[in-house]
């Protein structure tokens, strides 16, 4: 019955369908068993039980305890724990304080806490999605309008919306009055969308073009409407994005994977070497206790205890440097990951472009003008055929500019030297170009006050205003009438309503040939990626306007405007090409516009195809994999398209950075190896899903961040070379002691920890601030799958470790024999302190040599004064361990004579001399 309240049972509700935009309003009511008077409270309660609350559901993640427990799954930490237990048991058995065991346990716990702090940062992207929901909504139930919590909405509810409301669920419009909705967070399109209830759209229309539907999380800017809810909670478009977000699994970064493999190699190698040493010791008749001490020391020596902390500091330093270059790193490992990027997928608007519409071409019947200038700054030149002209000398131009300034609802605002607009960017550009010609838009609007208007709508595709001509300006043609009607909008539609045109400073009849010439000029602008507007006018005897008045118009001309590329982006794209990085444009904009901007920036070339979202949807995985190898520009894409593009690139071994600013971008940002959100225009959801935020929304900043990432990775390789080369030297030195029959372990676990944390750690921190190689962005990206030992690093560590240990073993034998001669005041066990000191001092020379492939004398000290300071400080700390009594007792060292110290210094210099000689030979050879 007409006007009846729906009271259908729960079983009467039909299954949800996918294409609500393709149904009529009546068909939607039938599908949902709903009515304009709303559901009854009973039916709503039944449906709430069936569909659940209108909320986003979060999957359970790892608990903090689970994250902490996972840190102890590291094989190197497990080995250190075993060493601590055995060492502590031996000390307690002998009645000694277990200082070695306690020191090792402290290191293990600190490393675990450090890992926990890096991993425990909860994902907040879903929380940000939830924050987009309004708490209350106006709904019609039991034929009565009422407010209910958003969570209580169900399919079939009739919601009532007006300006300022957030859309609480996905819904099909049933009534609308001048309804405009901001969907940029969901679709990426900046302009408000005109919504109409009485449309029936094709089934394959993308979300951004579903003008008869509303989507959860979007905002009503203007007008009012009534809509029928068809999806709630996780069934909405926002819920689909939440599902995609939670389906993307976080993977370890390349550095984390390399360090895991490094741990496996080091532990395996150490265990094999320990087995060999113990086996040989047994054959030589040595005691198990001595061999156990050797094994414990070797296990501690091979583990680079200070490496996690040094890497964290290096990444933090990189983060600070990136902030200075306008990029904020949200996840520390992303700093190094940037250095592996092989492909950058960038949005167009605001990232590659200025997000400011600029009029660049103007066509009148008699002239074609080119306009220069940047953004909304009212400064630039007008040119004809490349020659600068005076705008005021061309009446056709001035009348056209005046029409654009008057038929306009925007405002041009100056704040110091910064210019911006309030209102629609398209209209703002018309004010700017008028101001470039010397027209004061505000002043012109005062002398031509608006009397009436018909606003722009997506159906009319034009805007009309009637102004009173007070006779105080020459920028109109009164023709004896007190008012003038100005019209702007779709060139084709306005041209159809014109009978005359303004040419040769006078009115002329609009012939078929002239119409064709105007349309051809508009098509040329459109093919260059420009948004084209047509302008016309008609003197009027009355101040009112309706659609019947928009006839018998006089054509003024065309203006072509574009969101101009950022001037620095062309160079950034070129730098990417030199660095072996591919740049792709992925945008929701029109294919012609996207292609024109991409060609201008050097991203693509003439003849290269553009792939649209519709074409992409029709492709299977294999077809898409083939397409992404050659396509650089993607237009009219939806969120799932971005995700598919990223996944396809990753399947082919690409390491992908993806930019985004909307809610719709969040799944792709999370899936990408590096998700890059926009700091100015980005939503909270996109920022929480990202690894990095661009503070200036600028593509060039991504390239600068990639450069910093490469520098950080290069420095990490330097101090890994330094630390592990030294550790291998320590390991081989310790292993040789029982084989040489020296009767004692040359280094205690505590002394080894000192070397690994302090002697290695302080210079390694200084290596982390090494400046980058100027040619670093002229090389191809390093393979993210490469081993930590790749490009000669593994052979370097082995070579240096062997040479280092050879020098130290010779010193150890000499020192052992030399110190057995009794001398007053000197302990015969000081040979162990001499080995300890030689190893520490030799590592200082190693740190100086490892910073560059150039000879040290060719590398200026001023480029990294921190390294020299760290060497001096570490050497002084080592001497304190040797000569300060409390430290002697704690670390088990003995005072050295001047001769002892001179011998240590002499042997420690041998490694530095060897490394410099190796570099000299390499330079001579190549």
Curated annotation (Swiss-Prot):
Residues making up the signal peptide according to the UniProt record: none
PROSITE patterns (UniProt xref): ATPASE_E1_E2 (PS00154)
Top-rank lineage group of the source organism: Bacteria
The enzyme's E.C. designation: 7.2.2.10
GO MF annotations in UniProt: ATP binding; ATP hydrolysis activity; metal ion binding; P-type calcium transporter activity; P-type sodium:potassium-exchanging transporter activity
Residues that bind Ca(2+) 1: 727, 730, 759-760
A biological process term (GO) from this entry: potassium ion import across plasma membrane
Binding, Ca(2+) 2: 300-301, 305, 756, 760
Enzyme class: translocase
Location of the protein in the cell: Cell inner membrane
UniProt keyword list: ATP-binding, Calcium, Calcium transport, Cell inner membrane, Cell membrane, Ion transport, Magnesium, Membrane, Metal-binding, Nucleotide-binding, Phosphoprotein, Translocase, Transmembrane, Transmembrane helix, Transport
Reactions listed under catalytic activity: Ca(2+)(in) + ATP + H2O = Ca(2+)(out) + ADP + phosphate + H(+)
Cellular component GO terms, alphabetical: plasma membrane
Extracellular side: 85-99, 280-291, 737-747, 812-832, 884-898
TM regions (residue ranges): 64-84, 100-120, 260-279, 292-309, 717-736, 748-768, 789-811, 833-852, 865-883, 899-919
Membrane topology: Multi-pass membrane protein
Active site: 347 (4-aspartylphosphate intermediate)
Record topology, Cytoplasmic segments: 1-63, 121-259, 310-716, 769-788, 853-864, 920-926
Matches recorded under Pfam families: Cation_ATPase, Cation_ATPase_C, Cation_ATPase_N, E1-E2_ATPase, Hydrolase
Residues holding Mg(2+): 661, 665
Broad class of the protein's primary localization: membrane
Gene3D superfamilies assigned: Calcium-transporting ATPase, cytoplasmic domain N, Calcium-transporting ATPase, cytoplasmic transduction domain A, Calcium-transporting ATPase, transmembrane domain, HAD superfamily/HAD-like
Job of this protein: This magnesium-dependent enzyme catalyzes the hydrolysis of ATP coupled with the transport of calcium. In vivo, probably exports the calcium from the cytoplasm to the periplasm and the extracellular medium.
PANTHER family to which the protein is assigned, alphabetical: CATION TRANSPORTING ATPASE, SODIUM/POTASSIUM-TRANSPORTING ATPASE SUBUNIT ALPHA
Family the UniProt entry places it in: Belongs to the cation transport ATPase (P-type) (TC 3.A.3) family. Type IIA subfamily.
Protein name per its UniProtKB record: Calcium-transporting ATPase
Organism: Synechococcus elongatus (strain ATCC 33912 / PCC 7942 / FACHB-805)
Gene name per UniProt: pacL
């Amino acid at each position: 019955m007409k006007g009846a309240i729906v009271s259908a049972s729960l079983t009467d509700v039909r299954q949800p369908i996918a294409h609500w935009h393709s149904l009529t309003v009546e068909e939607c009511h039938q599908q949902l068993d709903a009515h304009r008077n709303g559901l009854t409270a009973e039916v709503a309660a039944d449906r709430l039980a069936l569909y659940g609350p209108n909320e986003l559901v979060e999957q359970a993640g790892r608990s903090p305890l689970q994250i902490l427990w996972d840190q102890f799954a590291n094989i190197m930490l497990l080995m250190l724990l075993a060493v601590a237990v055995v060492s502590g048991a031996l000390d307690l058995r002998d009645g000694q304080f277990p200082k070695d065991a306690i020191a090792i346990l402290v290191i293990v716990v600190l490393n675990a806490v450090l890992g926990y702090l890096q991993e425990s940062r909860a994902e907040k992207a879903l929380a940000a999605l939830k924050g987009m929901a309004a708490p209350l909504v106006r709904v019609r139930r039991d034929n009565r309008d009422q407010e209910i919590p958003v969570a209580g909405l169900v399919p079939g509810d009739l919601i009532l919306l007006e300006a300022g409301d957030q859309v609480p669920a996905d819904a099909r419009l049933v009534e609308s009055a001048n309804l405009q909705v901001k969907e940029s967070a969901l679709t990426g399109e900046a302009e408000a969308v005109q919504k109409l209830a009485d449309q029936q759209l094709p089934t394959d229309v993308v979300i951004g073009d579903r003008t008869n539907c509303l989507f959860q999380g979007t905002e009503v800017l203007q007008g009012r409407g009534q809509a029928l809810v068809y999806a709630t909670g996780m069934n909405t478009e926002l819920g689909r994005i939440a599902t995609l977000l939670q389906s993307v699994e976080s993977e370890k970064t390349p550095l984390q994977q390399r360090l895991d493999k490094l741990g496996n190699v080091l532990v395996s190698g150490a265990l094999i070497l320990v087995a060999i040493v113990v086996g040989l010791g047994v054959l030589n008749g040595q005691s198990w206790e001595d061999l156990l001490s050797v094994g414990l020391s070797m296990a501690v020596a091979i583990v680079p205890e200070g490496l996690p902390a040094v890497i964290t500091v290096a990444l933090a330093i990189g983060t600070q440097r990136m902030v200075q270059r306008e990029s904020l790193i949200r996840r520390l490992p992303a700093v190094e990951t940037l250095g592996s990027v092989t492909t950058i997928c960038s949005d167009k608007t605001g990232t590659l472009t200025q997000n400011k519409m600029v009029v660049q071409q103007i066509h009148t019947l008699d002239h074609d003008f080119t306009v220069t200038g940047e953004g909304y700054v009212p400064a630039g030149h007008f040119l004809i055929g490349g020659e600068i002209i005076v705008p005021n000398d061309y009446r056709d131009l001035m009348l056209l500019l005046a029409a654009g300034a008057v038929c306009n609802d925007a405002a041009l605002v100056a704040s110091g030297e910064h210019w911006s607009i309030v209102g629609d960017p398209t209209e703002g550009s018309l004010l700017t170009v008028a101001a470039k010609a010397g027209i004061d838009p505000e002043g012109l609007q005062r002398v031509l006050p608006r009397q009436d208007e018909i606003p722009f709508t997506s159906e009319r595709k034009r805007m009309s205003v009637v102004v009173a001509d007070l006779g105080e300006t020459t920028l109109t043609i009164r023709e004896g009438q007190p008012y003038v009607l100005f019209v702007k909008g779709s060139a084709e539609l306005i041209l159809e309503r014109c009978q005359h045109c303004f040419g040769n400073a006078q009115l002329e009849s609009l012939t078929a040939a002239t119409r064709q010439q105007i349309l051809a000029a508009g098509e040329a602008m459109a093919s260059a990626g420009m948004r084209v507007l047509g302008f016309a006018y008609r003197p009027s005897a009355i101040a009112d306007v309706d659609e019947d008045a928009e006839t018998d118009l006089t054509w003024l001309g065309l203006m072509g405007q574009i969101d101009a590329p950022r001037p620095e982006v062309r160079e950034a794209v070129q730098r990417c090409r030199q660095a072996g990085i591919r740049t792709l444009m992925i945008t929701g904009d029109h294919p012609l516009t996207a292609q024109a901007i991409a060609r201008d920036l050097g991203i693509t070339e003439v003849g290269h195809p553009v792939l649209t979202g519709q074409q992409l949807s029709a492709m299977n995985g294999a077809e898409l994999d083939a397409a992404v190898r050659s396509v650089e520009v993607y237009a009219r894409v939806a969120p799932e398209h971005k995700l598919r593009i990223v996944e396809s690139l990753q399947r082919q071994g690409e390491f992908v950075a993806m930019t985004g600013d909307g809610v719709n971008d969040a799944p792709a940002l999370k899936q990408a190896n590096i998700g890059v959100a926009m700091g100015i225009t980005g939503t909270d959801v996109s920022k929480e899903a990202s690894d990095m935020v661009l503070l200036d929304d600028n593509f060039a900043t991504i390239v600068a961040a990639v450069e910093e990432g490469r520098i950080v990775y290069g420095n990490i390789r330097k101090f890994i070379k330094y630390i592990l080369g030294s550790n291998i030297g320590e390991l081989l030195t310790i292993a040789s002691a029982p084989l040489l029959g020296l009767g004692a372990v040359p280094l205690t676990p505590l002394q080894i920890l000192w070397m690994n944390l302090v002697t290695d750690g302080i210079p390694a921190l200084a290596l982390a601030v090494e400046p980058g190689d100027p040619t670093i962005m002229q090389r191809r990206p390093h393979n993210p799958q490469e081993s930590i030992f790749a490009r000669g690093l593994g052979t370097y560590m082995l070579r240096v470790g062997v040479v280092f240990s050879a020098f130290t073993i010779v010193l150890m034998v000499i020192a052992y024999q030399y110190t057995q001669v009794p001398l007053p005041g000197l302990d015969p066990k000081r040979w162990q302190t001499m080995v300890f000191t030689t190893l520490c001092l030799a590592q200082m020379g190693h740190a100086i040599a490892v910073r560059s492939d150039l000879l040290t004398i060719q590398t200026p000290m001023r480029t990294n004064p921190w390294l020299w300071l760290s060497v001096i400080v570490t050497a002084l700390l080592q001497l304190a361990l040797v000569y300060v009594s409390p430290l002697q007792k704690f670390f088990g060292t003995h005072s050295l004579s001047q001769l002892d110290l001179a011998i240590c210094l002499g042997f420690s210099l041998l490694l530095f001399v060897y490394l410099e000689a190796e570099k000299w030979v390499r330079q001579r050879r190549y």
